[in-house]
Amino acid sequence: MIKLSQKFDVIVIDIEAHMKSEHNRKPYHIAWTRSNALDKTAPMECYEWYVKEFLHPTMWKHTFTDKNTGERRDWKIDSRADSVMKRAMDNPSLVKPLAEIYEILQMQISVSDAIGSYNWNYDSKALDIGYRALNHTDFLSNIKHTPFCLLDCFANKIVNKDYFKFIDELPKYEKEQYKSKSGKNLGYSAEIMARYVNRDHFYIEEHTALNDAKIEMALLKHFISKQKKSFFDDFLGKPKYVSWTTIRDRVSSAEKMRKREKKTRQEIESERIQLEFKL
């Protein structure tokens, strides 16, 4: 266990990527923050770049596959394109080749204790997809790192009976701010968790990489301040998928953690059997 007097230098990364096309999840905007996660007042280093190779105008076209011909057809232009391209052109120093960005990131990871994001499943895959497009190999599997997923942390520990009580006592117009995009169920995005933690019902994320990484670093520090032992024992180095049905069904935090632990044990046993088979 890391003591409060010690440092725990962590990278929180956020990636904005292409979608709904053959360029799905190729990252065009990569940013991360680095800070001592054990100290809410510790300074935050910030890094942000646009990926030169993935800013080409043709990459912003949303496409679909024609059922009759099997060919890909243009649908519309990504609504983010104009603002992203304008900012990139206005700030040429923020535009770097992919290889250079990954080189800096790899160096940062090597001197950090962990790396994670709110949705590690998404961001880690986007990192690998971007790297694979130019190097024909994954990025993360080739470097030593300790991952974590804030969505995993918050959905299992912060979304608990106190959270549901808080939501239920809100007036209707405020309660709506904690719903998913469909409006059918309670949401659990970083934006919604920031609303809950800060009691700011109408907070809206910019959905730009650096701003989101800053918010997510704040969420990490909040979580560790409340659930330090659980973070290091249960979540660090063990990111897991989150089932939205556990939020919908208001499963207790204790039950979610029991199921999560059981899943971990099953995976460990499966890995042990596979290793024995190989030997």
What are these regions (language model features)?
Residues I2-K3, P171-S182, Y196, L210-L279:
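Acidic two-metal-ion nuclease catalytic site recognized across multiple nuclease folds
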Residues I2-S124, D128:
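Conserved non-catalytic scaffold segment of RNase H-like nuclease domains
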Residues I15-M19, D152, I215:
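Short, glycine/acidic-enriched loop or turn micro-motifs at the edges of active sites
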Residues M19, D113-S117, D138, H201-H207:
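Short helix-to-loop capping/linker segments positioned immediately adjacent to catalytic or ligand/cofactor-binding
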Residues E22-N24, L127, Y131, K157-N160, ...:
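Short, function-defining helix-loop hinge/capping sites that tune catalysis or transport
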Residues L55-T58, T65-A88, L150-A213:
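Active-site-proximal helix-loop-helix substrate-binding element of RNase H-like nuclease domains
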Residues N121-F148:
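Substrate-recognition/cap helix-loop segment adjacent to the acidic, metal-dependent catalytic center
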